[in-house]
């Protein structure tokens, strides 16, 4: 499997820079198999999710909460640096991406500042070739609240503002730790969640803290050589029980977003209900838990595009993305959504 198999051309005008006025105003592309190995593509509104779910189905949300994970600072030499938390590994330790003119050495000190003129210092204690291990002087979360900035994705070109502070979080966000939102969940508001519940559709949660590695480009053309980044996840017992009951009663497990799917499939593969996962899903992967997937449109050559291609079929996804571009769907984090079911679970 080659990286170039997952490339496509996207007009920049289709990259959503701001959220729509209401969460549920987005469009929804339903991708179905027609029995002839072709994709049947249905243009819908997100509110039509109410007609796509069925009594007895289980919607699984990622309840991670985006933290203010971007920090600005200076090296001891005065050079400007930017830190982006990749994942938090302890009360006072993190792995981070650092944007600087040169690679920082172990033992280097970086002085972090905020707009109020306050400062604190961190020490570089390790480097694995991609991410730096950094020691903080105090609790990481408390320092991020005072010094951090909301880490909007690199393709969103404006500085974070009050709108982003509200709309780049899902309404189910509960557990702080993500540096990017689980974007499929951004389409839901409290009202539509209640309507779904009234239909007899159950809801459950997992936690997977989306790391900065989700935006790191895949550099290996041969995908078998790609090293997937790690992300921390946890699945409560009540969610595992809900999945088991759903399967026994003939319902479908519907993952809201690729992060929910990765958490569920990581548990199914390892038997562990929590920990760090570097599960890399590409075409040929045998899914064990998730039947249907609600997801946004993903970047070219990204591991998330590979995941949805594995889930719904490469030809179906190529056709769906081409259709979405022609119909001017909005792409990426603040964009529109797709509803996919696994090929063996999709009926004509």
Swiss-Prot record:
The keyword Transferase applies. InterPro entries: QueA, QueA_dom1, QueA_dom2, QueA_sf. Keywords: Cytoplasm, Queuosine biosynthesis, S-adenosyl-L-methionine, Transferase. Its EC number is 2.4.99.17. Its main location: cytoplasm. It is found in: Cytoplasm. It catalyses: 7-aminomethyl-7-carbaguanosine(34) in tRNA + S-adenosyl-L-methionine = epoxyqueuosine(34) in tRNA + adenine + L-methionine + 2 H(+). The keyword Transferase applies. One of its GO terms (cellular component) is cytoplasm. It holds the Pfam family Queuosine_synth. GO terms for biological process: queuosine biosynthetic process; tRNA wobble guanine modification. One of its GO terms (molecular function) is S-adenosylmethionine:tRNA ribosyltransferase-isomerase activity. Pathway: tRNA modification; tRNA-queuosine biosynthesis. Belongs to the QueA family. Transfers and isomerizes the ribose moiety from AdoMet to the 7-aminomethyl group of 7-deazaguanine (preQ1-tRNA) to give epoxyqueuosine (oQ-tRNA). Monomer. This is S-adenosylmethionine:tRNA ribosyltransferase-isomerase. It comes from Polynucleobacter necessarius subsp. necessarius (strain STIR1). The lineage of its organism: Bacteria, Pseudomonadati, Pseudomonadota, Betaproteobacteria, Burkholderiales.
